[in-house]
Regions:
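N-terminal Rossmann-like dinucleotide-binding module
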Residues: 1-49, 171
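Beta-loop-alpha module in the N-terminal Rossmann-like domain of NAD(P)-dependent dehydrogenases
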Residues: 15, 49-107
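C-terminal helix-rich "cap/oligomerization" subdomain common to oxidoreductases
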Residues: 59, 66-69, 290-292, 299-344
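NAD(P)-dinucleotide binding in Rossmann-like oxidoreductases
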Residues: 209-300
Length: 344
């Protein structure tokens, strides 16, 4: 399987490096080379990793069975449409496109040409999330915060498509219900697109998600909190540090055998909720500190893409998943624009 990398900026270089590692460990995977509009950058990366530098997208296409698109979001559609027409399997960095119409066309071409698209919503492969998935149950309230500093590198899209899209995808994957209502607000500060946004998403099944994203923070923050009713539990994830904690009600005798309560915060919370032991007959509050595997989420999702192509199996993050994420992102942007018009 010959795979090319399109766009070798910071993220594209990560893809190239990991693809080379995967190719080294595999008998049927080969990095065919790289392509970038910045030819100097492409040649620099090609020399660094010992691969070909293609002078055009057409030349790369002729040498590949699949490709990784790690270019700016606004260019995803045109590049993907061209490659799908040549029957290439595609890994497209998130978001899949900027509009529903573009996503629908890519999905049509994917089906028409019998190929696979996987969208790079990397947090689905985050080891911290995977460590707590078995304990989450049915989330009825999710709180997500994703903050970063301002970067001129990403100003072609709003913070909703740049950062919030990660948590939109996670929320949609964790709450299996149609959306009932969306309320949102946001502001433009240093760019012509939204730099800060917050949204409340209400679902038909009664679940709610509050999602906040900003690229105006001095410090990075990537946290997710779940409150579930079946089983009754609370889970906290810090994607930046890879740490996770779970508190849940269990029957007497079913508490985790690995319950060292090393965290002072955990001990304090159990003390605060001590009355639960008295009010919930036969139930105790258990603390679980899941062991988070030391894996590379980007490598994991690339390997999943390769296996999807190799075995002709569905992608964990499909083109339809990518479409749904940008559909919700679009509704959030529309709600923010409507609120801004009212203020004016």
């Amino acid at each position: 399987m010959n795979i090319g990398v399109i766009g070798v900026g910071k993220l594209g270089e990560f893809h190239t490096k990991l693809l080379m590692e995967i190719a080294h460990d595999s008998k049927d995977v080969h990095c065919a080379g790289v392509y970038d509009l910045n030819t100097e950058r492409a040649e620099e990366m090609a020399k660094k990793y010992g691969v070909a530098s293609f002078s055009s997208l057409e030349l790369l296409t002729r040498s590949c069975d699949a490709a990784i698109i790690a270019t700016t979001t606004s260019s995803h559609y045109e590049i993907a449409r061209t490659l799908l027409g040549e029957k290439l399997h595609l890994f497209i960095e998130k978001p899949i496109t900027t509009t529903i119409e573009e996503a629908d066309e890519l999905i049509r071409l994917e089906k028409e040409n019998g190929v696979h698209i996987q969208v790079g919503h990397i947090e689905r492969f985050n080891p911290a999330l995977r460590a707590v998935e078995a304990h989450i149950g049915r989330p009825m309230y999710i709180q997500a915060e994703r903050l970063s500093s301002f970067s001129r590198r990403v100003t072609d899209v709003s913070v909703v498509l740049d950062l919030m899209i990660h948590d939109i995808d996670l929320v949609l994957s964790l709450i299996p219900s149609e959306i009932k209502n969306i309320a949102a607000s946001g502001v433009k500060v240093f760019s012509n697109e939204l730099d800060m946004a917050t949204a409340r998403i209400d679902f038909v099944n009664g679940a709610t998600a509050n999602v906040t994203a900003s690229r105006l923070s001095r410090n990075r923050l990537r946290k997710l909190r779940f409150f579930s009713d079946n089983p009754k539990s609370y889970a906290s994830l810090d994607f930046a540090t890879g740490k996770s904690e779970v508190f849940k009600l269990v029957k007497q005798g079913e508490a985790s055998s690995k319950n060292p309560l090393k965290s002072f915060a955990a001990r304090k919370i159990l003390e605060q909720f001590g009355e639960i032991h008295e009010n919930m007959q036969g139930m105790v509050l258990d603390y679980i500190h899941p062991e988070v595997p030391k894996t590379n989420a980007l490598r994991d999702e690339l390997e999943h893409f390769i296996n999807t192509v190799r075995n002709n199996t569905p992608a964990t993050v499909s083109s339809l998943d990518g479409r749904r994420a940008i559909m919700v992102a679009g509704k959030i942007a529309e709600e923010i624009a409507a609120n801004a018009a009212i203020r004016e």
